[in-house]
């Protein structure tokens, strides 16, 4: 994916956030599927590292997606036990809080207002630095992100109902759709924001590719693109 390659080479923390977010989502899925505590503690650890990297979004995505996932499965009790795990909270606090405590001690209220309120809440409430867009701002970006395998992505959405019936695939769909919806509603829009949900879509495309692998024509756009490069 060209956008993923570009963000991987950009001088920003977004590639690291995407990596840590993907790791936290994977461990969260494993915990709610296998109910083994090591996966839950891994989720807290990766979320804490993501929180250090880019802030609250690293916590919001796994918390929101797992909540919706558990509500749909009628397992809100399991979600509550996971989110409020004392050991998990301790792991998160030991990793993430010291830096924020030090920054708050140095800068006081200015750090809280600037980092949390302005650059997180403020970005959602309205456009900053002219980065606005319509509700469908991310649609062409997603289409570009899945090129040259656009046909596979489209087929995933055509077979949406089938994937929705499978618990793992539903989790991946929720991951992608939550990020897409959240940032589509955000006042500030930047192209790379939607990348935080694309791993979920990419994994669904990989599943579809296993079914779709006999249709060799799907690789023609990829060969043309790499030939031009």
Regions found by a protein language model. Name each.
Residues 1-217:
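Membrane-integral, polyisoprenol-dependent glycosyltransferases
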Residues 213-229:
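Signature aromatic-anchored transmembrane alpha helix within multi-pass, membrane-resident enzymes
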């Amino acid at each position: 994916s060209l956008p993923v390659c570009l963000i991987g080479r950009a001088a920003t923390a977004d590639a690291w956030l995407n990596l840590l977010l993907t790791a936290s989502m994977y461990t969260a899925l494993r915990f709610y599927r296998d109910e083994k505590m090591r996966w839950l503690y891994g989720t807290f650890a990766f979320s804490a590292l993501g929180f250090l990297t880019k802030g609250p979004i690293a916590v919001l995505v796994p918390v929101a997606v797992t909540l919706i996932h558990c509500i749909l499965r009628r397992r809100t009790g399991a979600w509550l036990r996971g989110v409020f795990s004392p050991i998990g909270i301790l792991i998160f606090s030991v990793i993430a809080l010291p830096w924020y405590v030090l920054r708050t001690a140095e800068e006081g209220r200015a750090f809280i207002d600037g980092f949390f309120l302005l650059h997180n809440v403020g970005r959602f409430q309205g456009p900053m630095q002219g980065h606005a867009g319509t509700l469908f701002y991310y649609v062409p970006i997603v289409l570009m992100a899945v090129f040259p395998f656009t046909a596979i992505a489209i087929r995933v959405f055509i077979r949406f109902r089938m994937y929705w019936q499978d618990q793992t695939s539903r989790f991946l769909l929720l991951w992608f759709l939550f990020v897409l919806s959240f940032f589509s509603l955000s006042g500030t829009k930047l192209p790379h924001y939607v990348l935080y949900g694309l791993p979920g879509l990419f994994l669904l495309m990989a599943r579809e590719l296993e079914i779709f692998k006999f249709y060799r024509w799907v690789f023609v756009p990829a060969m043309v693109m790499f030939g031009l490069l």
